[in-house]
Amino acid sequence: MKIALTGGASGIGAATVERLLRKGHEIVIFDLRKPDVDCPWVPLDLMNTGSVDEALEQADGSFDGLAFIAGIPPRDDNAAACLTVNTLSTCRFIEGFLPKLKDSAAVVSVASRAGLGWQDNTPLLDELMALEPCLLYT
């Protein structure tokens, strides 16, 4: 099976790549850093929407699956980065990748404990999503 995998250069993503390769799957890794394994690699910076779009354009062929494993942990000073990487860019990449998936394909999205604290970010979400009008129409 041909599987696209984000976050495959380190951590859980790298371990997943190794296991899938041992089982004989073809893996295409999307990551900011070049992985240490011999697999096709597409640069992907989830902080940059242009990079997300470029990575989607570079994904050749059709895929049997997508494993979205990339993410960053929350810290006191990176709420906006967490929202961008772990939510907004995740959705952008997955939605953009759907046309490249075969009808029988599976999508797996891995989240960490970072997904548990999303409620703490609702003030930032409100600000970034501009839920209040900037001006009134009359």
Question: What role is predicted for each listed range?
Answer:
Residues W41, C82-L83:
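A hydrophobic alpha-helix adjacent to the NAD(P)-binding/active-site core of NAD(P)-dependent oxidoreductases
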Residues F93-L101:
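Hydrophobic positions on the long internal alpha-helix
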